[in-house]
A protein has these predicted regions:
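A generic structural motif
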Residues: 72-76, 113-122
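Charge-rich, low-complexity N-terminal segments
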Residues: 1-54
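Short, highly charged C-terminal tails/helix-capping segments
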Residues: 142-183
């Protein structure tokens, strides 16, 4: 019998214990930061990103399925139709998981994988899909849903000589070339 990690409560079935051991082995072998979650059979894994600093993923081994959930971005301030259309189109190309929203309109990526399908390869693929879903479109989502706020922040920082480091990826879009001064 596979010994359970001491930081994750033991699920109730042999199949669930096997799946939890597989998930734990994959995240440990990959050197990913992880810890036990608040629920039985839950591991909370931090995936480092390039556009989004990090993505925190909840992996919960339940009686029949591995539940996967990760926050992507908060509810857009503007251009809701374009913002959500972009996500829905990405859903068509995304294997295993899908985007969804909560009652506040915040965007998550998630899904459920049957326990019998939980292998090292599948867990690795799921983590890759989560990372691509959260990190890949992050800058486009910011521009679609938060452009006005970003422009105000840029203009404010420029007018005061503040650092633009956190907005540097958007310089080509936000920098005013028309000679206009911030309001």
């Amino acid at each position: 019998m596979t010994e359970q990690p001491e930081y994750a409560p033991t699920p109730d079935t042999d199949e669930a214990r096997r799946a939890l051991a597989v998930v734990t082995r994959v995240v440990t072998d990959a050197g990913l930061e992880h810890e036990a979650g608040a629920r039985d059979g839950e591991l909370v894994v931090t995936l480092p990103g390039e556009k989004k600093l990090k993505t925190v993923v909840s992996l919960v081994v339940r009686e029949r399925a591995l539940s996967v959930s990760a926050f992507v971005i908060r509810n857009a301030d503007e251009n809701h139709e374009q913002f959500y259309r972009h996500l829905l189109r990405r859903n068509l190309r995304m294997p295993l998981l899908a985007y969804s929203i909560d009652a506040s309109g915040d965007v998550y990526v998630g899904g459920r994988i049957p326990l019998r399908a939980v292998t090292e390869e599948v867990v690795d693929q799921v983590l890759g899909v989560v990372l691509e879903a959260a990190d890949g479109p992050f800058n486009e989502l910011l521009l679609l849903g938060f452009r006005s706020s970003m422009q105000k922040e840029w203009d404010w920082r420029v007018s005061r000589g503040e650092s633009l480091r956190n907005l540097e990826a958007f310089r080509s879009v936000l920098e005013r070339t028309d000679g206009a001064t911030p309001e």
